[in-house]
């Protein structure tokens, strides 16, 4: 018995049996089925000479079986993972073999060859028993494997979603050995299927009693069906239930990448991050139009080593540009971009250049050398408190740097210039936001001026994109919260009522590319950022998600220049619909280029005096709606 157990464990612990072994087992089953049927029909009266002749007859029929096995490839599956489809293949193979056998039966005996003459019903019985035997072999093997290797040590798990991929996900975790997740039921919103049994497990309704059921079942993990990702993100009630109970939540990749034909046995699950819990809609863009614009073109990206810029590099590289001219003054991050391009896109000619956008001579040499077709301008200082204390740098880098790149784009015939702006440019309350608003004004006025003078000739088109906070960026609160949680707290939030719009970096960059593709010049495109999020709620969720205990939230008060909430439109702006449901066009006043340029030149000259008050006063003159908040510059608003 011990030898049998060892053999059984050896067999079941193998990765997979070779095809020929499965085929050999099926042939043996067919042979024994023939002997058994013959023995039954003749009530056990089988002489030795009959056995020899019968074996010869059975081998003839087994040749017909091999035809069916080959056509339907019954031997190609992994037995321990057998499914209804595998059993169906066995049945179809045996039906085909039976049909061939019945035809050949009359041919063989018409020629009076030396075979045992079987009746039609005996042949049918032989094939029926063989089919049952082959199916039993697969079912028993699968059952033994599940019993021997299925352990209660797996994490007790519920699956969120039934109809849309939930069953496929359940099958995938059951075939995963050793067992990591132990299926204990499903969660659904549909009352009509609540309480039903699926795959031997109960379906539970998302209601007020769900928390108690999860406690009773001792659930430690919930897996979200791939096609239910979006719904789960918006189900904050269920998220709170799970987080409060300390249940781990796992999701797979984006639902748009799945279809009904997908192989769910290859689902790659990951424990959720805070980004997965923020309500947001899936963003789709016109990839064909973007590809037609960028393919085989020379593309310049400023700020290429930053959060937005580096993602722009990745997304644009997909469309196979002729060259990428990547500009950033941060040496080490730029070096990392160079390595990324070498390893991930070695076929693309990428020039990773360390340079400051505010160095006119250096930038002109770059434009003259590489002659870009399109410019995506993402370089900027963006930290509000830092720029509040260093307004001269905000002017010299953000405003002067933008002017340099914009002017050179016109001079060297760039087709389109796309600037990345921020919602902090709307009704600005801080230096950084005001500097970006001045950049918007300059690009718009320059676009109008050169197109008025073009007389129908092609001219550089200037497009501005405006959006809010992006998750995981260098300036995001999330990395700070993560560090504070790991350190044991407290987590610092400026105000309990402060809210922000959030978007994933890849989603924001997709919309930048979409706007850049379709923009005709002069527009400010405003992105729909979805639902605003309370920063305090974000902090609480991150604490719960980490599993940390006794971490407090400390409210420190608004920082200089900080708003309680951000806007994407000023009080004097309206929007028009655009080519994309997530993108609106801001209706803004037009500015005279000569006047704007004169004002900016004066501001830039003033920035070299490093007189903070004088610099900010001039910025307020250019942008009258700039009203400082909780800042030393508030005194200037009372003049």
Residue ranges and their predicted role:
Residues 214, 218-220, 321-322, 367-376, ...:
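Proline-aspartate-enriched helix->loop->beta-strand connector
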